[in-house]
Structure formats: C-alpha cells, structure tokens
Amino acid sequence: MSRVAKAPVSIPAGVEVKLDGQLLTVKGKNGELSRTIHNAVEVKQDNNELTFSPREGIVGADAQAGTARALVNAMVIGVTEGFTKKLQLVGVGYRAQIKGNAVALSLGFSHPVEHALPAGITAECPSQTEIVLKGADKQLIGQVAADIRAYRRPEPYKGKGVRYADEVVRIKEAKKK
C-alpha cells in the first residue's frame, strides 16, 4: 500500500465532508469543493477521519490511493486555510493592476493583456509588479498562475518576464566577442 495513503486525512471542526459513492464533497468557510475519486480507491469515513485503501486486484490501485489521499487533503486545507500563489513582474514598464474580475497586465506588447479570473479565485496587487492569487482550489490557483506566467515567461539573459515569487531564474552569460 502507498505510504501516503496509509495516513488518514483528519477533518477539522467546521468542515463538512459528504461521501456519495465515489463523489466526495468538502465544505468549509472558504467554499465548497468536490472531486470524483478513482474506482480503484475505497474511501471510508470514520468520525473525523477519512481513510483511503486500494481495492484488491486492480493494477495501479496503490498509486491511485496515494493520489486520492493527497488531493483530498489539499481540498480540506483549501476550504479551511486557502492557498496563495505570488507572481512577480520583472522588467522595465511591466505592470499589473486589478480591473474588476480580471488582471490587466502591461508586458511590453503593443496592447495591454487582460486575464479573466475564474470563479473562486481572487487576486490583489500589493504593488504594480506583484500579483497575489488566493483561493480554495490548489489546482485551479496553480493553473491560473501558469496561464499568467505564460504571457511572458522569464527570459534567460536578463530575467525579464513574469515569474513565481519563489522561482529562481538562471541567467546565461552573454555572447563574447
């Protein structure tokens, strides 16, 4: 059995978990998330714990049990604490601002880029060169951050572009004569 799946997911106070067949719904102060658990995984709810075990005779069930446990744990953390992702804009004239339910980016193109935010994700700009994304769905926050970064990825010679706050951009040496 997967080492990750052996540990049960504890359900904190204020979080409501509903298991309907293979559909798991987690509800908390930050919203509601639901996910369909793979058929190779058996989920049991005992008091304030969820346990995940692989079904017998299915190839890859151990791996699916560990994956399901990690995804559900992220859902529980998301509805209680939430997740944040920080982006930095590095470059002359690179700016960001919030316009309603979208992030307006000035990234050196001839036109400003507007990225609409999906439901459940909020953004704020503490400064013109910083974007902070917040929400309950870890996967969705990562996807939105990756989409914004894809408009202008950091280039390797000067490091200009949109980068994650914890990302280290390796700078190449310029060509010598």
From Swiss-Prot:
Gene name per UniProt: rplF
Species this chain originates from: Pasteurella multocida (strain Pm70)
Family: Belongs to the universal ribosomal protein uL6 family.
Cellular-component GO terms for this entry: cytosolic large ribosomal subunit
Biological role: This protein binds to the 23S rRNA, and is important in its secondary structure. It is located near the subunit interface in the base of the L7/L12 stalk, and near the tRNA binding site of the peptidyltransferase center.
Biological process according to GO: cytoplasmic translation
MF terms in GO: rRNA binding; structural constituent of ribosome
Assembly and interaction partners: Part of the 50S ribosomal subunit.
Entry keyword set: Ribonucleoprotein, Ribosomal protein, RNA-binding, rRNA-binding
Protein name per its UniProtKB record: Large ribosomal subunit protein uL6
